[in-house]
Amino acid sequence: MKYDNLLDRFIKYVKVNTRSDPDSETTPSTESQEAFALTILKPEMEAIGLQDVHYNPVNGYLIGTLPANNPTLTRKIGFIAHMDTADFNAENVNPQIIDNYQGGDITLGSSNYKLDPKAFPNLNNYIGQTLITTDGTTLLGADDKSGIAEIMTAIEFLTSQPQIEHCDIKVAFGPDEEIGVGADKFEVADFEVDFAYTMDGGPLGELQYETFSAAALEVTFLGRNVHPGTAKDQMINALELAIDFHEKLPAKERPEYTDGYQGFYHLTGLTGTVEEARASYIIRDFEEASFEARKVKVENIAQSMNAHLGTKRVLVELNDQYYNMKKVIEKDMTAIELAKEVMEELAIKPVIEPIRGGTDGSKISFMGIPTPNIFAGGENMHGRFEFVSLQTMERAVDVIIGLVCKA
């Protein structure tokens, strides 16, 4: 094993349930994230040599510093990962370690689930490698505890090898990325760097500086309930209004029909009765004009329906969540060019593609710190079929070390 503590560190982290809660109004959204930061990560950060390690209870970020040991390396680089995991069972995570994977199915614990290369052809990229999987009852949490483990391991390596020269390094572990609010209260003044990287990507080589622009859409439908036996010309069924609204959106502009640079409307929840219904959507697109056009379209649909109904029964609430960070990063591509150079020197082919999602880096970039995203190794994230390659995690550590030594 290239880095002795990497695997054990990762296993320790994923066994802690840090699932975030979209319905919470606190920061972090769950107490377990704060406990993870204070009882596990903070003591470890101090033990491996990070300085000024402190937790901010206002924004839920745990931050530490490793000062430069060569004054000629004047850049300051940050590394960021998130502590929370996605909306899937994260209680009693019991990872499996598959040494020297030789292809074929991987049975997930004693469950009836398996990782099958026919369903998940990405498994074929990992022949001969050590894979960490779930037992079929939980997610794994490689998103983003692989990133945390990689950053910690890189710092540990640097402090144990003081002859290796490096620039100033800032480390931040934050909450609630999976529910889209993790960076809302991020304090740039507490993270003085020239640029940063989120270690929150997927397979080997990912280097990303384009994200979706994102909005949340809540639509409330107000009906009028009367006895169905006497409902003619009187009842207005809120559920039918919701169906009508949904059918007016482009049917092929949904996640299951789109890829690459294509945006979408995604219905994530629908509840209600005849009297009142509520539909929740997320809206995503890469180009600013297309993003704005999607929001205008839903407003126009609501206005048209209300005009037809003769009163306001379709109420739209739109909230922007984050924006495509390409707009910021393209102004100064130093972070991207440095990462490309380091990867190529390590014989890693940079895979520069848009993220069909977002990262904390999206918001942080617009706060003034360009923050692209680098691979952390996770595959099939957010569910029971999640896995990660130990060798890919090791390569991520290599990249972190390469970045701070080349700066």
Swiss-Prot record:
GO CC annotation: cytosol
Residues noted as binding Zn(2+) 1 in the record, renumbered to the chain: H82, D143, D200
Biological processes annotated in GO: peptide catabolic process; proteolysis
Keywords, in A-Z order: Aminopeptidase, Cytoplasm, Hydrolase, Metal-binding, Metalloprotease, Protease, Zinc
Catalytic residues in the record: D84, E177
Residue positions binding Zn(2+) 2: D143, E178, H382
Cofactor binding notes: Binds 2 Zn(2+) ions per subunit.
Cofactor annotation: Zn(2+)
Subcellular location: Cytoplasm
Assigned EC number: 3.4.11.4
One Pfam family, short name: M20_dimer
Gene3D superfamilies: 3.30.70.360, Zn peptidases
Gene Ontology terms for molecular function: metallopeptidase activity; tripeptide aminopeptidase activity; zinc ion binding
Catalytic activity: Release of the N-terminal residue from a tripeptide
Function: Cleaves the N-terminal amino acid of tripeptides.
Protein family membership: Belongs to the peptidase M20B family.
NCBIfam families the UniProt entry points to: peptidase-T (TIGR01882), PRK05469.1 (NF003976), PRK13381.1 (NF009920)
Protein name as it appears in the record: Peptidase T
